Curated annotation (Swiss-Prot):
InterPro entries: Leucine_aapep/pepB (IPR011356), M17_PepB-like_N (IPR047620), Pept_M17_PepB (IPR008330), Peptidase_M17_C (IPR000819)
Organism: Klebsiella pneumoniae subsp. pneumoniae (strain ATCC 700721 / MGH 78578)
Cofactor list: Mn(2+)
EC id: 3.4.11.23
Protein name: Peptidase B
Length: 428
């Protein structure tokens, strides 16, 4: 085992020989990070990425100034999808160490799950991983049901079944109940719905290779919302919450769905498929119908839903949509408290009407006349939320995954959003 490289924090600028803008320097004791009070967490994360890039795989966070958030910022930048890294953590009090340990367990689970190859992580495996994580955190407070394949069709989950039927791996709906009250009749406080497309080829509206090569990550919404529930439980969530993961492959075969097909949903809506690569909203619709039936105070769905959200925000922010201004502001306050980046994008009543079809109530994609793709996607989902004006948040997870490394992040999943959603769920 190699000796650990000591990483210390300093509020003094680096020696002038390192340059006036230097944020880190090397000394006889190890590496010093020079905080300037402007964006200290970002500075630590960027420095950690550079330290990892130098091939240093064993570090000790030493000296004064370390706390949970600073140690976590270091790990967020230091962790990568391949190779082993060892960190000797700073001395923290019990509460801070517990918080750090829970982040390491749960958010690393989210990142590792999103990074897993599609060959290893199909719909059933994703659902089972979610069950294992949540049962490990909450034990007997968890109950669940897994419905798959033809059982979905027979029970009316036609959006999920339609999208997933083209794969040899059957589509799966995970319906999970976290009930800490012990009362089977306890009201449901929140319902969480996640898009779990374990690989998205685009179907017959096939993607180019440059857009398909990262589509193992199209289940990022499901992983994020699962991690958020698990993390909220570790922070003392004492209200009943239900989780719905809509898991499928979107592949091409003789049994795959086709353009012009019409899906009949349980809430009476019909949808014409005019783009098989707009499949996420088709599976989420089934989960949102179930969520609405629970009459919760809060519904949150999370999905890597549109390229339009990434065009607007890049990979740095998650996109937030809601008709409920007060609730949207609560989510944004939670994001600020957790130092995670969310940005609200427009969602208006007219977006609900920008999906016209000649043969059904809705088209699953907007036409060229209605180019606000992220907003029309949110508008589509609103048709499956019973009381869409209140208590519903849609998160288009544009910050879930990066195809290549940047100064703060390695290539792959980020885990962003888990803490924000957990904060909202546990806020009084």
């Amino acid at each position: 085992m190699t000796e650990a490289m000591k990483i210390t924090l300093s509020t003094q600028p680096a020696d002038g020989r390192w340059g006036e803008k230097a944020t880190w320097s090397i000394n006889n004791d190890g590496i010093a990070l020079h905080l300037n009070g402007k964006d200290d967490l970002g500075l630590i994360q960027r420095a950690a990425r550079k330290i990892d890039g130098m091939g240093i795989k064993h570090v000790a966070l030493s000296g004064e100034g370390w706390n949970t958030d600073r140690a976590w910022a270091f790990w967020a930048g230091y962790k990568g999808p391949k190779g082993q890294r060892q960190v000797e953590w700073p001395s923290l009090d019990d509460a801070q160490r517990s918080e750090l340990d829970n982040r390491l367990t749960i958010i690393d689970w989210v990142r590792d799950t999103i990074n897993a190859p599609a060959e290893e992580l199909g719909p059933e495996q994703l659902a089972q991983r979610a069950v294992d994580l949540l049962c490990g955190v909450a034990g007997e407070k968890i109950s669940y049901r897994i419905t798959k394949g033809e059982d979905l069709r027979e029970q009316g989950y036609l959006g999920l079944h339609t999208v997933g039927r083209g794969s040899e791996r059957p589509p799966v709906l995970l319906a999970l109940d976290y009930n800490p009250t012990g009362d089977k009749e306890a009201p449901v406080y929140a319902c969480l719905v996640g898009k779990g497309i374990t690989f998205d080829s685009g179907g017959y509206s096939i993607k180019q290779s440059a857009f398909m090569d990262s589509m193992k990550s199209d289940m990022g919404g499901a992983a994020t919302i699962t991690g958020a529930l698990a993390f909220a439980i570790t922070r003392g969530l004492n209200k009943r919450v239900k989780l719905y993961l809509c898991c499928a492959d979107n592949l091409i075969s003789g049994n795959a769905f086709k353009l012009g097909d019409i899906i009949h949903y349980r809430n009476g809506k019909t949808v014409e498929v005019m783009n098989t690569d707009a499949e996420g909203r088709l599976v989420l619709a089934d989960g949102l119908i179930d969520a609405s039936a629970q009459k919760p105070e809060l519904i949150i769905d999370a999905a890597t839903l549109t390229g339009a959200a990434k065009t607007a925000l890049g990979n740095d922010y998650h996109a937030l949509f809601s008709f409920d201004d007060a609730l949207a502001n609560r989510l944004l306050a939670s994001a600020q408290a957790e130092n995670e980046a969310f940005w609200r994008l427009p969602l208006a009543e007219f977006h609900r009407n920008q999906l016209p079809s000649n043969f059904a109530d809705l088209n699953n994609t907007g036409s060229a006349a209605y180019p606000a793709g992220a907003s029309t996607a949110a508008g589509f989902l609103s048709h499956f939320v019973e009381n869409y004006h209140q208590g519903w948040l849609h998160i288009d997870c544009s910050a879930t995954y990066r195809k290549s490394a940047v100064e703060q992040w390695s290539a792959g999943a980020t885990g962003l959003g888990v803490r924000t959603i957990a904060n909202l769920l546990t806020a009084e």
